[in-house]
């Protein structure tokens, strides 16, 4: 081997990794945001004041072997439809899942999770947990939710009342969207909306795409905290769901929100409105 070639490679091996600090920063971000791909990590770095090319972030992620690998499985979707037992509202939203006005368009749905309880003899019994949540289409923020062991009218009306109160500052007439689940058809539910001068909107029967914005949130939630794991208590599963919702609202950035989290986007909108 020529001496010049030997010296070249020796210098390369002895040279300190110029990307060491950035690699450590990216590893730190991935430890907090486990579902972030290179685009979100690049946006987060830019939000923190770092100047780096998106392709370089992608190369570092590939080098560190920390590409996102989401665990998914097919599971039967929770179906609360029990036929026509009340009034079916028209589909006012019609898949227009966006508004520039906070608290104007709200959507809701219920999903279920499974967990086990083990008795003294080691026998496992399967149980279910239900999440009722309301989302603001303005910034995809989860405004309120209930986590319960059984679906009930009281639970859904409780979280509905909280959402109506939270969104009462909207100066325009509000629209609350849902599927045709049994609870949303009840007179008690529709009466509360009518009393608040709120339009009621419903998806068409068996058309989950009419509420895909909420379906996407449930899918993300389950990929992050549920699929691939087994829970052995109600409290353990409930705590994980609450942790994710807080993280989703306050920290998880979205491209459609200008790489801000739902709460950051809302606060930024509020500041801009005050200035105007």
Q: Model segments located where?
A:
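Generic alpha-helical secondary structure signal
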Residues: 1-5, 155, 159, 188, ...
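Mobile-element integrase/transposase regions
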Residues: 51-63, 67-133, 157-159, 166, ...
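RNase H-like two-metal-ion nuclease catalytic core shared by retroviral integrases
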Residues: 80, 84, 178-180, 186-187, ...
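C-terminal domain-tail junction helix/linker
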Residues: 194, 220-276
């Amino acid at each position: 081997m020529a001496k010049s070639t030997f010296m070249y490679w020796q210098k390369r091996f002895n040279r300190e990794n110029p990307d060491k600090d950035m690699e450590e920063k990216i590893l730190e971000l991935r430890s907090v945001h486990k579902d972030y791909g290179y685009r979100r990590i690049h946006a987060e770095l830019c939000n923190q004041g770092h100047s780096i090319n998106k392709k370089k972030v992608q190369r570092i992620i590939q080098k560190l072997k920390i590409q996102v690998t989401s665990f998914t499985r097919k599971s039967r979707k929770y179906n609360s439809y029990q036929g026509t037992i009340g009034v079916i509202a028209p589909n006012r939203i019609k898949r227009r899942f966006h508004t520039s006005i906070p608290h104007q368009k709200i959507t809701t749905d219920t999903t279920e999770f499974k967990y086990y309880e083990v008795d003294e003899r080691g026998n496992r019994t399967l149980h279910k947990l239900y999440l009722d949540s309301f989302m603001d289409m303005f910034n995809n923020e989860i405004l309120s939710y209930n986590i319960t062991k059984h679906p009930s009218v009281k639970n859904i009306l409780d979280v509905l009342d909280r959402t109506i109160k939270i969104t009462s500052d909207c100066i325009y007439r509000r629209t609350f969207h849902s599927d045709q689940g049994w609870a949303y058809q009840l007179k008690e539910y529709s009466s509360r909306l009518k009393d608040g001068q709120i339009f009621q909107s419903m998806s068409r029967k068996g058309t989950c795409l009419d509420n895909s914005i909420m379906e996407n949130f449930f899918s993300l939630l389950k990929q992050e905290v549920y699929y691939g794991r087994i829970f052995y208590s109600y409290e353990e599963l409930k705590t994980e769901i609450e942790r994710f919702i807080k993280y989703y609202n306050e920290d998880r950035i979205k491209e459609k929100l200008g790489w801000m989290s739902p709460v950051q986007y809302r606060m930024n909108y509020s500041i801009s409105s005050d200035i105007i």
